[in-house]
């Protein structure tokens, strides 16, 4: 598995590829690839969750180039600078935090896939959207805890899409 990162995007754009997709990359457009070396115990879903969190997006905006309309270039140069919380795989509490984030991230993806299938049916989409949004908040709270932040502290981080949104 690998993560395909949309280099120039307005919000988190970190897709997991488990189909072996061929990707072209380079510069401030296109895509870049993130892989976890086989000898590492990290899940690519853990990395995806951290990068897509409020903290990850904020750091991408600080390190990346910001373009008109709220587009942020988040290529390999930027991604290398974003600190991913290390997990001590000898510590059961750390392992549990990692696995909890991974489980929730996979569930978010599954619900997102279901939402895409029913997007033209508001009656079916509405409950899925509520579940998805509640799960996103739960995931963000878990990531806050991982970094030792309260929800109040996390809310002090400006949302990039609001700061750089095109009107």
What are these regions (language model features)?
Residues 1-96:
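Polybasic, glycine- and aromatic-enriched phosphate-binding surface used to engage nucleic acids
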Residues 85-167:
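Non-catalytic DNA-recognition/assembly elements of restriction-modification systems
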């Amino acid at each position: 598995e690998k993560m395909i990162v949309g280099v120039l995007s307005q919000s988190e754009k970190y897709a997991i590829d488990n189909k072996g997709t061929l990707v072209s990359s380079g510069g401030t457009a296109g895509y870049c690839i993130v892989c976890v070396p086989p000898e590492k115990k990290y899940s690519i879903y853990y990395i995806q969750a951290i990068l897509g969190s409020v903290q990850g997006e904020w750091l991408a905006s600080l390190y990346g180039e910001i373009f008109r309309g709220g587009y942020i270039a988040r290529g390999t140069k930027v991604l290398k600078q974003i600190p991913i919380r290390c997990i001590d795989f000898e510590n059961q509490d750390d392992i549990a935090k990692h696995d909890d984030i991974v489980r929730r991230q996979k569930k978010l993806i599954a619900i997102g896939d279901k939402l895409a299938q029913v997007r033209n049916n508001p009656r079916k989409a509405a409950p899925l959207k509520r579940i998805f949004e509640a799960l996103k908040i739960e995931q963000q709270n878990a990531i806050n805890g991982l970094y030792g932040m309260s929800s109040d502290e996390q809310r002090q981080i400006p949302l990039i899409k609001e700061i750089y949104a095109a009107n």
